[in-house]
């Protein structure tokens, strides 16, 4: 799977599943058209993160979609994921690239042109930018204005994915601005039918 083939990017949050089976939600999302899954876990032990990552990797492998780990290079290497996503407060991109070589993808969060250009220069393979519509899954996420998102897209050559409160009702606003794709958390996982949610987001984005 190539990044250029990826339109819908799922970022996980088990709480967003609202009691539905976490792994089933991921599988149904992939069936709907998700091409990248990022496992994001902030408050569990390394051992539990590792176990969870192995299960999610198995699902991704079965459907031949990309599997990304949030923040943790050790888990990324241990489960042989496809890559790691690094926020501004995570390990520096250049250090991660030095450790991972070219065997893994590196995604980076960028909220302005400077961060985006720096991420590209330091070896990031793609950028995640937001929060474009605000978000319920990150307490400290500041909203990114549409004009600023467009500037980020135009400032780099690597793929850019928008993130933050994206769902079936607002994704159409992100059409035709040069994005590679969109990331969603609750816009997919909190819906009753995850597969249908992805299909509808994809339909409204294309």
UniProtKB/Swiss-Prot annotation:
Q: Where does Mg(2+) bind?
A: 71, 90
Matching CDD domains: TMP_TenI
Instruction: Give me the residues that bind 4-amino-2-methyl-5-(diphosphooxymethyl)pyrimidine, please.
Output: 38-42, 70, 109, 138
SUPFAM superfamilies referenced in this protein's UniProt entry, alphabetically: Thiamin phosphate synthase
TM region positions = none
State the Pfam families in the record.
Answer: TMP-TENI (PF02581)
InterPro entries linked to this entry: Aldolase_TIM (IPR013785), ThiamineP_synth_sf (IPR036206), ThiamineP_synth_TenI (IPR022998), TMP_synthase (IPR034291)
Q: What's one GO BP annotation on this UniProt entry?
A: thiamine biosynthetic process
Cofactor requirement? Mg(2+)
Q: Where does 2-[(2R,5Z)-2-carboxy-4-methylthiazol-5(2H)-ylidene]ethyl phosphate bind?
A: 135-137, 165, 185-186
Q: Which UniProt keywords apply?
A: Magnesium, Metal-binding, Thiamine biosynthesis, Transferase
Q: Which superkingdom heads the taxonomic lineage of this protein's source?
A: Bacteria
- Drop me one GO molecular function for this one: magnesium ion binding
Protein's pathway: Cofactor biosynthesis; thiamine diphosphate biosynthesis; thiamine phosphate from 4-amino-2-methyl-5-diphosphomethylpyrimidine and 4-methyl-5-(2-phosphoethyl)-thiazole: step 1/1
- The EC number(s) attached to this protein equal 2.5.1.3
Q: How is the cofactor bound?
A: Binds 1 Mg(2+) ion per subunit.
- Please give the function described in this protein's UniProt entry: Condenses 4-methyl-5-(beta-hydroxyethyl)thiazole monophosphate (THZ-P) and 2-methyl-4-amino-5-hydroxymethyl pyrimidine pyrophosphate (HMP-PP) to form thiamine monophosphate (TMP).
Q: Which family does it belong to?
A: Belongs to the thiamine-phosphate synthase family.
Protein name per UniProt: Thiamine-phosphate synthase
Organism field: Fusobacterium nucleatum subsp. nucleatum (strain ATCC 25586 / DSM 15643 / BCRC 10681 / CIP 101130 / JCM 8532 / KCTC 2640 / LMG 13131 / VPI 4355)
């Amino acid at each position: 799977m190539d990044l250029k083939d990826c339109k819908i990017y799922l970022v996980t949050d088990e709480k967003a599943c609202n009691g539905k089976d976490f792994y089933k939600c991921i599988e149904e999302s992939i069936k709907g058209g998700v091409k990248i899954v990022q496992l994001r876990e902030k408050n569990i032990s390394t051992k539990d993160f590792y176990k969870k990552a192995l299960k999610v990797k198995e699902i991704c492998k079965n459907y031949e979609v990309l599997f990304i780990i949030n923040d943790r290079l050790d888990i990324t290497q241990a489960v042989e994921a496809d890559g790691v996503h690094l926020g501004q407060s995570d390990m520096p991109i250049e250090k991660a690239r030095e450790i991972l070589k070219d065997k893994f993808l590196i995604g980076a969060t960028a909220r302005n042109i400077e961060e985006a250009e720096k991420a590209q220069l330091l070896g990031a393979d793609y950028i995640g930018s937001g929060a474009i519509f605000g978000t319920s899954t990150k307490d400290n996420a500041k909203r990114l204005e549409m004009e600023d998102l467009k500037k980020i897209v135009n400032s780099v050559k690597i793929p850019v994915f928008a993130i933050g409160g994206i769902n079936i009702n607002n994704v159409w606003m992100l059409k035709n601005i040069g994005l590679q794709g969109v990331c969603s958390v609750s816009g997919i996982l909190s819906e009753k039918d995850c597969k249908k949610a992805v299909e509808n987001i994809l339909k409204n984005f294309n």
